[in-house]
Amino acid sequence: MDKFEVFAVSVAELQRASESDGAVPKGWIEQSPLGRVLFKEAASKRSRITESRSDWTEKVTSELSQLLVLPAARYELADLIETDGTKVPGSISVDLLQAGDDRRIPLQELLEQSIPSYDQANDYQVKNVIQTLLDTEVKLPPNYEVPDGIKDGADMFVGILLLDAVVSNEDRHDHNIEIVQRANGELYISPVFDNGSSLGSTETDRNRSQTSPKQYSDEYSISFFDGQSSDITGIEAFKQAAELRPEAARVWLERLASIKPEQIQSIFDRLPDNRITTEAKSFATELLDYNRTQLLKFRRELIVSEQDLTTLYQQYFQNTQSLGLAQVKEIAKAALVEKV
């Protein structure tokens, strides 16, 4: 099986700018085989680059996004060639700018406009994000394919949360979800980007050996979203979104269900051996499999529309008029298992 290509970019062309305010050194390269790209080093400290790194995670998540048909930045593995010939491993992402785009707006800015005295610690909630996207009429990104049934930016946000839940992304804060304002004033949600803190990539092999993927997902994969009474995991954040946008949640879960385990394994098998340790690969694949299993269990329980309930009522309960809707829902969950 062919390994993923590793692109070479020159440090002489690297323009370190305001993008370097994150934890990992990065900078723009205006001309590359893929056009304008953002290079990001594999780790914040080069001494940790063998075990804790984000380059392979960005590539894996980029490939998973394609399988989900979720609009996302294209990521490729890359080496930054220093003036002395030293290779600095990292990743490149293709510039998301499109013709007609005016400016990119951090989600935080929209939330501040919608919520008086917005405070990320308390107000960065799934319900607030969805309501803000709806109130501001944020659309889907142009020139990208999405699954049938995904209609607007709020629906795509549900897909972003699904991706984050699958890969245990712990860094989906209100600055790495962006809204793009077009020259005509329209707003659309940006294709997803910045997935480096996923699949346990920041852990050492020693920590991976001492933590089961289940424990990591259930206890340590805490999202940025506020759960009011307690922190919530990425899976819990997606479930909250599913309550508010059940039709969109069903579409994204169906996409997840359509992905075969061998397709996921193929992505990991194509990573060059010097980009990921054996322990990291094993931990990441088991973590992804656990998260996927948990989400597909939830899919079997999700009743997504009143139309489904009406159909089931007519099919199974037309002679039992005394049943209330709540009772129908409980019985319908079991009846819908094979349907969904």
Task: Please report, for each region that a protein language model flagged, where it lies by residue.
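Conserved kinase catalytic-core segment
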Residues: 131-204
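Conserved ATP-binding subdomain of kinase catalytic cores across diverse folds
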Residues: 1-119
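Active-site-proximal helix-loop-helix substrate-binding element of RNase H-like nuclease domains
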Residues: 113-141
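Generic structural hydrophobic/aromatic packing signal, biased to beta-strands
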Residues: 29, 39, 75, 93, ...
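C-terminal catalytic region of ATP-dependent kinase domains
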Residues: 53, 66, 182-340
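Active-site-proximal structural scaffolding
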Residues: 54, 58, 156, 170-173, ...
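A broad, structural surface signal
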Residues: 59-67, 155-163, 286, 293
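Short alpha-helical "patches" and their helix-cap loops
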Residues: 75-83, 173-183, 304
